[in-house]
Amino acid sequence: MTNIRKSHPLIKIINSSFIDLPTPSSISSWWNFGSLLGTCLALQILTGLFLAMHYTSDTATAFNSVSHMCREVNYGWVLRYLHANGASMFFICLYMHVGRGIYYGSYMFKETWNTGVILLFTVMATAFMGYVLPWGQMSFWGATVITNLLSAIPYIGTDLVEWIWGGFSVDKATLTRFFAFHFLLPFIISALVMVHLLFLHETGSNNPTGMPSNTDMIPFHPYHTIKDMLGFFVMMLALLCLVLFSPDMLGDPDNYSPANPLSTPPHIKPEWYFLFAYAILRSIPNKLGGVLALVLSILILVIIPLLHTSKQRSMTFRPFSQCLFWLLVADLLTLTWIGGQPVEHPYVIIGQLASILYFLIIIVLMPLTSLMENHLLKW
């Protein structure tokens, strides 16, 4: 008699994806972030569902409903801070996952990579809309500033912004639709994750050497399930420490003041995980130029497979490319720091130089370095 996990129409899909899946034996802990992202998504959907039971998407009551949740709902504060800090963990895992893809050449699986970039955009949109919902000062002004960027689009810009707002400013209609989309998008993300995994399982996983590993495969369960569980416990420990000891560390104090259209906060800034893109936006004095740079700072990931000039897939045996990669990481950390600083000297010039370096590394320096490494190895 055939084992049920290999014969049942539904269970055999799970079996071939998570149990008997042939996996390279050499993949390191950098391959844990996919499962951690799945965990984060499940956590965000669960906590978000319970938060939505107590939230009201009306400008008059939104701020008070969040306050009520934290004060009067049993463990409401845990749910709220798990959701808010869970988003931070989500983005930490996302950026590490993308970084791993760039370092080890996983972008050569073009379909998997492109669905991943679409996922990144969707998660960013979801997080932005979620930040607007508590209807604090930074929620209101963040929504106003970021949506207003669309007015830079020639001819249709102003109409587009007013269409998104549902009026002539960020108001009740905006909050209601943002809540509707914030609730809907995680389920669309879940469907996109399925597509992402479908494409990944067509080719199988990459490995640190970047070479085919068809001759050295092991089953996903129990080896990698145990390894993923370690990552899960480390992440949950970090998240719980954040939630229980310093839940507001990554938030903005301005968001504890109710939204007031008549008083602008001294420094309008998004959540920390968008600061690098915000710094690139601010570093260009022209509005349309800034918006284009903002979009391109993420969209540039799509052309990374086209810029691959090396004969080797992974950076494991390419020391010059490794130096450039870590320079890119340092540059992104610098941009994140600059995004949180006021627009004054010397932060402006540092931001502009870091923005130029960001695009320069990806578009010019990495392909040229790869060609140089090919030449050094007589290829």
From Swiss-Prot:
Taxonomic lineage: Eukaryota, Metazoa, Chordata, Craniata, Vertebrata
Subunit structure: The cytochrome bc1 complex contains 11 subunits: 3 respiratory subunits (MT-CYB, CYC1 and UQCRFS1), 2 core proteins (UQCRC1 and UQCRC2) and 6 low-molecular weight proteins (UQCRH/QCR6, UQCRB/QCR7, UQCRQ/QCR8, UQCR10/QCR9, UQCR11/QCR10 and a cleavage product of UQCRFS1). This cytochrome bc1 complex then forms a dimer.
Organism: Chalinolobus tuberculatus
Membrane topology: Multi-pass membrane protein
Primary location: mitochondrion
Protein name: Cytochrome b
Subcellular location: Mitochondrion inner membrane
Example GO BP: mitochondrial electron transport, ubiquinol to cytochrome c
One MF term in the entry's GO annotations: ubiquinol-cytochrome-c reductase activity
Cofactor: heme b
Bound cofactor: record note: Binds 2 heme b groups non-covalently.
CC per GO annotation: mitochondrial inner membrane; respiratory chain complex III
Additional comment: Heme 1 (or BL or b562) is low-potential and absorbs at about 562 nm, and heme 2 (or BH or b566) is high-potential and absorbs at about 566 nm.
Entry annotated with the keyword Transmembrane helix: yes
Family recorded in the similarity comment: Belongs to the cytochrome b family.
One Pfam family it belongs to: Cytochrome_B
Keyword Iron found: yes
UniProt function note: Component of the ubiquinol-cytochrome c reductase complex (complex III or cytochrome b-c1 complex) that is part of the mitochondrial respiratory chain. The b-c1 complex mediates electron transfer from ubiquinol to cytochrome c. Contributes to the generation of a proton gradient across the mitochondrial membrane that is then used for ATP synthesis.
Keywords: Electron transport, Heme, Iron, Membrane, Metal-binding, Mitochondrion, Mitochondrion inner membrane, Respiratory chain, Transmembrane, Transmembrane helix, Transport, Ubiquinone
SUPFAM superfamilies listed in its UniProt record: a domain/subunit of cytochrome bc1 complex (Ubiquinol-cytochrome c reductase), Transmembrane di-heme cytochromes
Binding-site residues for heme b b566, renumbered to this chain: 97, 196
Binding site for heme b b562: 83, 182
